[in-house]
Amino acid sequence: MSHQEQQFQHYPHHQHHHHHHHHHIHQVQSETQLEQRSSDLEPNRSRNTDRIGSSMDFRNLCQRIDVDGLKAKLPQLKLPKSLPKLRGRKIFRSSKSGSNAAGGGTAGGSAKDGAGAAQQTHLQVAGQSQQFINRTPQRISTISSLMYEGEQEEIRANLGQSQPGTYRSAGSLDDDYYAPGSGDRASRPISPIKIPVVGALDDSSPSENGNVRTTFTQRLQRGYKSLSELRIKHIFAKQTTVRRDNIEVDRYVEQYERELKSEKLARERRDREIAENYDIKIKTLAGTRQNTFDDDDVEHEQFERGKISHETDESGMEATPPLPSRRKPGIAATRFAKVRKPPLEMEEEQQQAAAEESPQANPPPPPPPRPSSYKQLLINKLPHLPSLPNLPQFSRTKEETTKTAENADENNASRKLSIRQNIKRLRKSIKRPSKIKSKAAAPVPDSDEEEATPDGQKTKDAPTRSSTANLRARLSRFASTEQLQQRWRKSFKVAKEPEELETKAEGSATGGASGVLGGLLVGSQLEKTLAKLNEKVHQLKFFQRNANNQNATTSKQPKPNTVGHEPIEIDDDELEATYHRSDSLEAENGNGNENDDSGEDISAEEAFGQIQEEDNEEDHSQDQTKRGQSSVSGIATAHAARQMAKLAEIQAASKSGAAAWSSESLEEIADEDYPRVLIHQEHSDAYESTLIIAVASKGSSMSPVVRSSGLKSSPAAGPKTSPHPEIRISASGPQKSMSYSPGNPRGEPVTKRSPSPEFKTPAGGNKIVPKSETSAWLPNEQIIAGFKEQTSWPAPALYKPKSIDIFEASAGGSAAFADFDEALRNAPVLRISAGSSIDTSGEEADDSCSRVTRIRVQSPQIGNSRESLMAQEEEDKEAERDSEEEEEERDPSERPPSESPPPPPLPQRRPPTKRPATPPIYDAVPPPLPVSKPPPPPSVETIPSVASLPSPAPVTRSMAQRSASMSRPAKPLVKTSSLRLTYNEQVRPGDVGKVNKLISRFEGGRPRLCPRRMHSEEYERCAQPEDEEPEMEQILELQIIERRAVDSVTPTNRAVVIPQITVNNNNNNERQLEQSDQSDQSAHQEITDTRKTKSMELALDRQNSNCSRSEYGSPLSFPSSRRSSTPTNLNANSNSNPNPSTNPNQNPSQILQHQRRSRRSMTRDDDNFYSFDSDEENSYYSISPSGSSRYVVEI
């Protein structure tokens, strides 16, 4: 066993193989031990148990453990005696099991401890492994234990007995990993309390052999410690750490489980809310509503009104769908919207007819007969509204002169009056409701019903503001009722519809208000804009939902704007409860809406129009200015700012109810779950990135969304359903640009108009430069522009977004947003991104914009738009940082921003020992070395993992590197840019936070830096061969500095890692490392020979550090992945390293892939890896997560 153990000493470094070997060893040892055990199985168990008990207080452990079961498992558990690199889990679990079983035996079979000391030694080794629950860095001690295992098996057994908690537990990685141990651990998965060895000895002292064993075991321990200093170190450090960690682990697990439970509860709660909302949507159906509300006369009355509004009143219909949207962009709303929109298109034809009829104010009968009667009611009642004359005039005036600023001003004046009145009413009604409404927010369907009802009631009762009074009365009554939430939604939204619809219109919660008001306004404007709207609605179908609010907002905001906004009709369509009728209903709305304009909806419309003029002010800033409403919107902006604040409050109280189609109306989903972010997801084989751009904080997302609705029907569309439409928009970006293109020209000016390139940069930049993508992103950018213009929300900080690759699926979204929060807090970093215009693009103003855009532009070049975008942005940020820190290197054209500082490869671990180790490998390899070109293909093989693009161009290393790096960025981008992903995958859950902190600290929350390194690597590979001299000269300054930093940082790792690797020549990883290291060494030699080579080496260092960083894998395995490819390129470039570097590169390329796999598996599997390499790994990451020491250097 000692021989095997010695072999396994080497394997520990090569974990991948090592595991297999460990399993084998487990079998072998288990056979020998089983023989011994079979002879003295019971005595051994009892003695072993006694020893274990003596060494540790297993009675405590036994309390938790099924001693008998453990005893049964002990023979198996003890089989692997401190197999060096078995998982710490294995060892610890078996140790726990063994020690627990032993503890049980100690308790139950202490009398059995008579003889069998030798056998007990073996058993104790396993048992002690079981005893040792520590999962901390037992790997090293495990390696040493493997080295000494055969020799010190008895010693170890004794040691384990005397010091089960100290080394022995650390010694056998089995404990945690071994299956029986795992089974035992299943009962108490974290770890039984690790009692100090002394305590255990004292506790087990009752057992005679236990005491003797303890003394003997202690002697053995001391001997073993003397044998292995590593063990002693780890025993001491780990002994304490192990116990502490185990306890902490228990706490951690409990906490983790609690967190999981809480998360699960929250998730279930959200799901329930969604389900409730969805159910409410179902209830929203006329029949269901009737059934539901028949009991409640008021509710039923409201429902009837709502149903009427749904059936007859476009506004009612309009109002209700926004509520579903509010509820949450749930599947029904988002997906059915698509399903319904074709009917909407068909309805649009009806709408055209209706729009034609709309001037007549005769509702087209195609909708339920109620529309006509309802419209008639509206016609009858609307005249009664005090504001009716003004608003109908304005609405008609706007219908007639939609683009006249005069009418806008008039409307603004009347609207301001009505808005203020309505807001006053709204405040009165909302003050209570806001509280209730938060509750009511869940059953938004009621609010839908009420939304529809309010529309209907508005139009019907609007003539008599008494509807508001009635609603208030109802609210008061309902407030007293337990059904207050539902009734409140109904009554409050009825009351709020006139009032808050104004606010909603303001808050782009105008879904319902837009339905009524927008429908009214749209009715008049539909005639004028209906053809455009129909055309564009077809185009904007995707955005109809999104634009619906916007459309409502647009239609309400400026009737003038409505002309320009196709989405208005869409908004009506979308807002229509049926979504089918939206066009015909909207046409009805056109008919009835003109009348409705004169209805109390006028007050809502005025409030809304004013609010929306504010939105329009954004829109008008961009669009309204065209319409001459900018003067009005100027006033409306101040007023809207106030009302938006109030609306935000209202929405905060009831996110779902407050805004019909505001992203907040999306309720928590868009508002809370998403900070109002543009999520751009691109998934390619090589690379999946989610580019999340935080547009606004949650709170501001309401009003920003609203404003964005005001901004453009299309941009508003994005905001309204912002989360869903954003994605959808990006998906249908070309369509949106198509459909939005009428608005898009405005959008484009809006984007440009948005003074902050910061906004434009992330969202706008991407959006603006690529038109299709621009349309995809434009809504956000325009939204941001609107936000920035109207709201004082810190658009630069908030929106200066970190485009985050969310590779971490579970926490990715939330973590990414947390990063956004940090980034928003750290706006300077984002602004630095603006500085990064120095990067490839000199667009400092549109820095992030150009950067994002440039990235996106490059993405087609690279062929991985997401990858390119991510890498490019990261390049931009990194180049930005480089620009900051390396202004000297601010020659973006000469050197790609990512290239500007070639990522310092992890200091190439090229220990002389490794070089010797590799030469034997190279002995076979030398022939390939002459083939410098073939080695580059291996490097390409290495690169293939990164990007298996051009393996053939090794000789042209510039070409090969370039092509390789071009295709290569894909996976490296993922690896490098997905530090957190890799960390999440490979870091123990407890360490994720630390890793993220490290990453964030050095990344500045910019995972993209890694992809940028890939680009820099790419550029270096490409440019260094070509521009190597000039570019490398520049880069060398950084590289030298960075290399110093890297060397200063990583030399320890280098020394530590490489010597280990060199020592462990048996391991493939070692060989890979040796090969890659030797290739690095040879490359280093080449580099030494050539400054290009040296700069390349620096690049290698950076790349290596990037790679090791990106691949969470240990630094050891890193060289194979990235360094190997870089060395291969280096070898290709400077074949001065003849055979060794070339062939090593080939081998490394192959080994690299294998090593990546093994390292990935190791990192994911390995607690040992962390325990063992965690220090090195962390040091790397403290360097590399910083963007490889380059961050340290740059920053």
UniProtKB/Swiss-Prot annotation:
Phosphorylated by aPKC which lowers lipid affinity and promotes dissociation from the cell cortex. In the photoreceptor cells, aPKC-mediated phosphorylation leads to its displacement from the stalk apical cortex and thus restricts its localization to the rhabdomeric apical cortex where it functions. Dephosphorylation appears to be light-dependent. GO terms for biological process: cellular response to light stimulus; photoreceptor cell differentiation; photoreceptor cell maintenance; protein localization to rhabdomere. The keyword Cytoplasm applies. Residues 1-55, 85-132, 291-471, 493-515, 544-567, 613-637, 702-771, 833-977, 1060-1195 are annotated as: Disordered. Residues 1-10, 109-118, 351-360, 940-968, 1114-1149, 1179-1195 have a biased composition (Low complexity). Disruption phenotype: Viable however, rhabdomeres are flat and oblong, and alignment or organization of the microvillar projections along the depth of the retina are not maintained. Severity of the phenotype increases with age, by seven days post-eclosion rhabdomeres have become irregular, misaligned and fragmented structures. The phototransduction proteins ninaE and, to a much lesser extent, didum are displaced from vesicles near the rhabdomere terminal web and instead become mislocalized to the basal lateral membranes. Residues 119-132, 545-560, 732-742, 856-867, 1075-1085, 1102-1111 have a biased composition (Polar residues). Disulfide bonds: none annotated. Residues 361-371, 898-910, 925-939 have a biased composition (Pro residues). The phospho-regulated basic and hydrophobic (PRBH) motif is sufficient and important for interaction with phospholipids permitting cortical localization. Phosphorylation of the PRBH motif by aPKC inhibits the association of the protein with the cortical membrane. Required for the morphological differentiation and maintenance of the rhabdomeric photoreceptor apical domain. Acts as a downstream component of the gl and Pph13 transcriptional pathway which is required for photoreceptor cell development. Likely to function by regulating the trafficking or retention of rhabdomeric proteins including the phototransduction proteins ninaE and didum. This is Protein PIP82.
